[in-house]
Amino acid sequence: MPKVLVLYYSSYGHIETMAEAVAEGARAAGAEADVKRVPELVPEPVAKAHFFKLDQGAPIATPEDLVNYDAIIIGAPTRFGRLPAQMANFWDMTGGLWLKGALIGKVGAAFTSTAVQHGGQETTLYSLLTNLIHHGMVVAGLPYSFAGQMNMNEITGGSPYGATTIANGDGSRAVSANEQEGAKFLGRHVAEIAQKLNA
């Protein structure tokens, strides 16, 4: 049974919701899946003033946790078309793991959220995946076998580079059913690949 880590950062809860869906998909494929988050860097008074969701239940991850998993799926919202400082800071602390080649051969994937459809989803996914590639991980996307990517009946996230959601500029749009299905598919897909690689 592969062990999957879903590692995320979420300001307003959209990525937290996606992370839980990713983990659900991995578990459906027979994997053991843990959900952890990276530390918040924004001072608490500022975070509260901007209505950040600070009551997230997932434990805080450390870089050392990464070696315990066969697959690592990372998620974070966009910040001007790239990963946010919180996730970048976490990966900046993994230099020791990189020196040892500790993550080489593990499966990796990514998911993100943006305010609007054209708010930098794929560039953010690229910036998340770059960390995994530099660590020598085997990167998986969200294949078109997930039929929801071809959904033209609603505004929806989804990219061959990873699962995505659209939050609206004020964060008022909830993660849609189709987007949650995409996240579950990604988790299941990664778990199945990890299972094959570890067979």
Curated annotation (Swiss-Prot):
One of its GO terms (cellular component) is membrane. It comes from the Bacteria. Its cofactor is FMN. The keyword Nucleotide-binding applies. FMN binds at residues 10-15, 78-80, 134. SUPFAM superfamilies: Flavoproteins (SSF52218). It catalyses: a quinone + NADH + H(+) = a quinol + NAD(+); a quinone + NADPH + H(+) = a quinol + NADP(+). Binds 1 FMN per monomer. Belongs to the WrbA family. This is NAD(P)H dehydrogenase (quinone). It comes from Beijerinckia indica subsp. indica (strain ATCC 9039 / DSM 1715 / NCIMB 8712).
